[in-house]
C-alpha cells in the first residue's frame, strides 16, 4: 500500500504557504534545540560556548540532517505538514527519493554555508593586513551578495510557479511533494462562530454597562432586602437611629442627614447623591432636601452597647 502511494503520480501540488510554513518550523526547531543546549551550560563560566558557537550549531544542524533528510527525505517541518522531498531531476513523474549526492550537497549548502557565514569574520579578522586574505574576503563577500540576490530572484519565481522555495532546492533539483494523497478537508466554522458571538456579546456589554446606574440599582436592592425598622417616636434621643448608617450598616463616620430621621456616613450619602440626583432614603423613601451634618449628644454607655 505504501509503495503504491509512493509511486503514484503527483496530482495535487504543494501549497506555497505549506512550504514556507515548513521552513519556519525548521528554523524554530533549530532555535529551540540551541536554546535547550545552551541552557545546559548556564552554571559554567560565562562565554564558554561563545568561542565555539558556530561549530556547535553546525554539529547540531548536521545531527538533524542525519536523522531527517538523510533517512526520511524530509525535514521536521515537512514531516509535520505531510510533505517530503522529491528528486525532480528524474525523468519519470513518479516519486523518486533523493540520491546520496543530493543529500550530501544539501548538507554542505545548509550546514557549511551557515558555518562559513558565522565564522568568516573571525577567520579574516586575525589577518587584517594580508593582501591575499583581503582578496579572499572580498571574493567571499561578492559571492555572499550574489547568493542573496539569487535567493531573492528564486523567491519571486517561487511565488509565481510554486516550486523550489529555496535556492538550494533549485540548484540541487529537489522539491516538496505530499508524502500521502490529500483527502478532502471538512471545513468547520464552529470555532469562528463561537468567537464572533462572544466578541459581539462583549461589545454589547461594553456599550450597555455605562448606561446602567449601578449605585442606584444597589440602593434599590438594599432597600428591598432590608426593610425599614420602626423606632419609637417617643425616644427623646437619636441614639437608637444614629448607631448605624442606612447604607453601609456601620457606625456613621461624619454623620449627615438628608432631612429625614435617618443618618448616613458623609461618604456614603455624598457618593450616592452624586451618582443619582434623585436619590431617596432606602428606609423611608425621602428625597434629599438638604444635606447637613448631624449634631447630637450620645452617652458613652450607649456607645459601649454596640
From Swiss-Prot:
E.C. no: 2.3.2.27, 2.3.2.36
Molecular function via GO: ubiquitin protein ligase activity; zinc ion binding
Name of the top EC class for this enzyme: transferase
Cellular compartments annotated: Peroxisome membrane
Residue ranges that the UniProt entry lists as topological domain Cytoplasmic: 43-48, 126-134, 213-306
Keyword Glycoprotein: no
Pfam families to which the protein is assigned, alphabetical: Pex2_Pex12 (PF04757)
Name listed for the protein in its UniProt record: Peroxisome biogenesis factor 2
Topology Peroxisomal matrix: residue spans: 1-15, 75-98, 162-188
ZnF locations on chain (RING-type): 245-285
Entry similarity comment: Belongs to the pex2/pex10/pex12 family.
Membrane topology: Multi-pass membrane protein
GO cellular component, one term: peroxisomal membrane
Annotated TM spans: 16-42, 49-74, 99-125, 135-161, 189-212
Signal peptide (UniProt feature, chain positions): none
Role according to the record: E3 ubiquitin-protein ligase component of a retrotranslocation channel required for peroxisome organization by mediating export of the PEX5 receptor from peroxisomes to the cytosol, thereby promoting PEX5 recycling. The retrotranslocation channel is composed of PEX2, PEX10 and PEX12; each subunit contributing transmembrane segments that coassemble into an open channel that specifically allows the passage of PEX5 through the peroxisomal membrane. PEX2 also regulates peroxisome organization by acting as a E3 ubiquitin-protein ligase.
Binding site residues for Zn(2+) 2: 260, 262, 281, 284
